[in-house]
């Protein structure tokens, strides 16, 4: 805990989010913008708010997020993971609820690297019999 802020780091693909939460009225600020302005897609907004709605803390905390790297979906996943960790830092009794929903586990899937002699990671050149 930093001052009266609780902290959590979230990661997803190549995105990293640093999340700070404190008691407030439910404002979520991502990189200096309101969350609705920062994330254009409704699915990204739902993803970010998921841990708060699951624990019935939708309007309990003010959240400040710094997120870098990745695209919109990766950043939304990183913010969700960070909020989850910050909530656990605030109140450890929330961990079983969040864990049951699968929000505590870091999604370890990363982009597979491109291999030499192939078009992409797995896409081969077209085979010609003749």
From Swiss-Prot:
| One Pfam family named in its UniProt record | Ribosomal_S9
Mind telling me which GO cellular component terms the entry cites? cytosolic small ribosomal subunit
The answer to whether keyword Ribonucleoprotein applies is yes
The UniProt GO MF terms for this protein read: RNA binding; structural constituent of ribosome
* Keywords for the protein's UniProt record, in alphabetical order: Ribonucleoprotein, Ribosomal protein
GO biological processes: translation
Concerning its family, UniProt says: Belongs to the universal ribosomal protein uS9 family.
UniProt xrefs under HAMAP family = Ribosomal_uS9_B
Give the protein's recorded name: Small ribosomal subunit protein uS9
Upper taxonomic lineage:
Bacteria, Pseudomonadati, Pseudomonadota, Betaproteobacteria, Burkholderiales
